[in-house]
Design a protein with these regions (language model features):
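Long, positively charged amphipathic alpha-helical accessory segments at protein N-termini or as interdomain linkers
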Residues: 1-12, 24, 91-119, 129-264
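N-terminal lobe of the biotin/lipoate ligase/transferase fold
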Residues: 1-114, 232, 260-264
């Protein structure tokens, strides 16, 4: 049964009702009107109430003042969007988690495509529509005793919030009344539930993600070289070629840091 835990925010009751109506998993939810970061809130929750792995947990915020992004980037998440940090149990029967962020991206694409939206996946963790950023993901794997026990996923999706240049919100894309934060919060949680099913079908996930990749070429920000995108490896690495040369990126190269990719 979905429950709201240690929560005095009226939003929680509506979410619990919607999730129960859809026969969702047994989520434990915390909703905050405002917080520095849902990632930090989730970490504190996992520390104060030790993880036993029975139920997935999620922290949701109306407004984040210091949201966490890739490589420690900080950003402010305004009211009107979906800002979630979730922890889900994972065990040996849950399948492979190598493509965790991409699996979440694909699961979100499925939900958005049902609304008629032409979503593209910008490797590794962003969702784009018409080259504008709609959502970003922050995946993490948590090991205990050398075994994967938990996956953590942060999701930020622009719904009815103001967005900066280069971004887009669902309210700009959907008919009036269809870009409701409560509805899309449930859609995100349902997408997170789907990843364990997808983890047992890695070839399917790879094929479907490759169909939705945002571009055919990428530019290396360090060298300025243009590489052709060939597809994905089963571990989620981006496979590239340039004439007779090939490369595999395991993360996006940074112009100020060493690349984490292999050349051949």
């Amino acid at each position: 049964m979905v429950t709201a835990v240690l929560n005095h925010h009226q939003r929680a009751g509506g979410l619990v009702h919607r999730l129960r109506k859809q026969q969702a998993h047994d989520w434990r939810l915390k909703c905050r009107p405002v917080c520095a970061s849902t990632e930090l809130e989730l970490s504190h929750w996992l520390q104060s109430v030790p993880w036993r792995g029975e139920f997935p947990r999620a922290v949701l915020a109306d407004h984040q003042t210091r949201g966490q992004g890739q490589r420690g980037r900080r950003w402010e998440a305004a009211r009107g969007g979906v800002w979630i940090s979730a922890a889900l149990p994972w065990n040996s029967s849950s399948g492979h988690a190598d493509m965790l962020g991409l699996m979440v991206a694909y699961a979100l694409c499925e939900r958005l495509e049902q609304a008629g939206l032409p979503v593209r996946i910008k490797w590794p963790n962003d969702l784009l529509i018409d080259s504008h950023k709609l959502a970003g993901l922050l995946p993490r794997l948590v090991f205990r005793g050398g075994r994967l026990r938990m996956v953590r996923i942060g999701v930020g999706m622009n719904v009815a919030n103001p967005v900066p240049a280069g971004a887009i919100a669902l309210r700009d894309l959907l008919p009036p009344g269809c870009a409701r934060r409560e509805v899309w919060t449930v859609e995100v949680l349902r997408a997170l539930e789907r990843i364990q099913t997808l983890a047992n079908r890695p070839e399917l996930v790879r094929r479907e993600i490759e169909k939705r990749l945002w571009a055919h070429q990428v530019k290396d920000p360090q060298s300025g070289e243009i590489w052709e995108i060939q597809g994905l490896a089963l571990n989620g690495a981006l496979q590239l070629c340039q004439g007779a040369r090939s490369a595999s990126w395991t993360r996006w190269p940074d112009a100020n840091h060493d690349n984490l990719y292999n050349l051949a």
